[in-house]
Amino acid sequence: MVAVVTMSDKNRDDLIACCKGVADMIDWLDSLNARPGLAELGTRLDSLPVNLEALKQHLVYTEDNGYQRNIIKKTEHYEMVAITWRAGQDTPIHDHVGSDCAFLIVEGTSTETIYELNEDHLAVATDVRHYAPGDVCAAEEPDIHRISNDTNGNLINLHVYTPPLSGFGIYEAA
């Protein structure tokens, strides 16, 4: 359902050389030596310039029904991931147990469906939000959601998890 690739040091260095926004975000995150606050992370992503063409040259997509996680950098305090979706691909309904998540929509339209659990522990949709390029979404745990690409084009989101995503719950829809 999900494919994961960690960028090689060479690809990451090439991306950082071509994409000042990504380089600056990594420098800021590395300078903290701690877990950044979600509000500040969202603010920084909101003003982050991303060289889309440079980023696209370093990303891959999966062709199955899932999505692709392109890990740019991971430390003990954060994980930066460019996630790609082809048309019709989505995540399972999930949470981020123990991690906060903020993401910037780089290309395409991202659809976030928010869920709450009913008495049977099944996920019931309560809200749907659409994000365009340049929009930022910041989700505190235990936010339960699904991200999907409901368009005919590709979708790229730049995610930062704090601390790195080490576990998550998967939920069945009601």
Indicate residue ranges for each PLM-predicted region:
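Glycine- and acidic-residue-biased ligand/ion/polar-headgroup-sensing regions
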Residues: 87, 98-118
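Conserved short histidine dyad/triad with adjacent acidic residue
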Residues: 81-96, 140-142
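A short hydrophobic beta-strand segment most commonly corresponding to one strand
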Residues: 102-103, 152-168
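Short acidic-glycine-tyrosine-enriched beta hairpin
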Residues: 102, 117-144
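N-terminal leader/capping segments at the start of a protein or of a new domain
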Residues: 1-53
